[in-house]
């Protein structure tokens, strides 16, 4: 998508086996590109959330397996790499899906061919993610158009970040919004701040604004009030994992928005590629592993101070 009129991707690779990502922990205050040069770089990028979003995690992990094979293509090392990558963000099923497919791909391959086979898989997955998200956008555009009333502005609420920053390009939940904007539809987005990591405030509001899409940042608990007062026409969110029965596991807070939408008779949509569906699960409650992250993500808020420095500020009592 566009950053100040220039087309960008959240992850980019080239024929020289170079992989470049955006350090999303610095957004919206600093746009910094980082080159991933090793398996450990990829693990750190996922674990520390330089990259995030289920589809992007899957692509990044695939390149991580390439680096693992390049460094040591032995079966033992690659099995260890598989386990380490799975542990970085266990909720996102795209991660597991991509890695399991890589293991199957190289199972009987000659050792010296493994790195190139994995690189080819990763680069194709990168391109496939873009194609899938574009198609999600096309389908979602039809849904948006069906909810437009009397040529008025259509107000869409979204939670967390399921845009191009999460999916190489286009995004899932935001792809239909970008397609609508590009078509000239008067679309406005209510952006949940999405505590504790504030992906909505830091990422969704940033990428929508950079593309020119009208949006308003709201606190997480404002959605129900807006719905009660007729200011939300529809909701679109992404998914970290969806079961075969349709249970959706997404960023904390999504369930409450779904309940509010249901109570106010507002359409609620989830946008996702097939790789986000876990066909081995029929129920999401208590069956999907939910990662537990550091308490500092709640007690500290990251931002920019009056000196222009990015820093953390403590907002709670000492525990």
Where on the chain are the PLM-derived regions?
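Short, glycine-rich nucleotide/cofactor-binding loops
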Residues: 33-39, 161-167, 244-249
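Short, hydrophobic/aliphatic alpha-helical segments
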Residues: 34-50, 154-156, 304-319
């Amino acid at each position: 998508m566009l950053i100040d009129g220039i087309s960008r991707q959240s992850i980019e690779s080239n024929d020289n086996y170079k992989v470049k990502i955006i350090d999303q922990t610095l957004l919206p205050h600093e746009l910094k590109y980082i080159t991933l040069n090793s398996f450990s770089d990829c693990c750190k990028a996922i674990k520390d959330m330089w990259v995030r979003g289920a589809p992007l995690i899957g692509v990044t992990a695939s390149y991580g397996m390439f680096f693992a094979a390049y460094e040591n293509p032995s079966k033992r090392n690659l099995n260890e790499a598989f386990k380490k990558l799975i542990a970085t963000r266990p909720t996102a099923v795209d991660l597991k899906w991509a890695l399991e497919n890589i293991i199957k791909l190289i199972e009987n391959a000659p050792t010296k061919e493994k790195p190139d086979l994995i690189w080819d898989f990763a680069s194709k997955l990168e391109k496939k993610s873009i194609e899938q998200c574009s198609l999600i956008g096309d389908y979602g555009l039809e849904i948006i158009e069906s909810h437009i009333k009397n040529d008025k502005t259509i107000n869409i609420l979204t939670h967390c970040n399921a845009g191009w920053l999460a999916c190489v390009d286009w995004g899932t939940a935001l792809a239909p919004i970008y397609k609508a904007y590009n078509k000239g539809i008067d679309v406005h987005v209510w952006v949940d701040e999405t505590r504790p990591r504030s992906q909505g405030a830091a990422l969704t509001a940033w990428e929508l604004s950079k593309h020119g899409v009208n949006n308003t940042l709201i606190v997480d608990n404002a959605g129900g009030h807006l719905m009660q007062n007729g200011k939300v026409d529809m909701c679109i969110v992404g998914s970290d994992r969806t079961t075969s029965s349709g249970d959706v596991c997404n960023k904390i807070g999504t369930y409450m928005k779904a309940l509010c939408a249901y109570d106010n008779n507002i359409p609620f949509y989830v946008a996702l590629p097939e790789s986000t569906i876990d066909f081995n699960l029929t129920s999401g409650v208590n069956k999907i592993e939910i990662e537990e992250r550091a308490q500092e993500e709640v007690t500290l808020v990251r931002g920019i101070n009056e000196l222009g420095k990015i820093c953390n500020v403590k907002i709670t009592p000492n525990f």
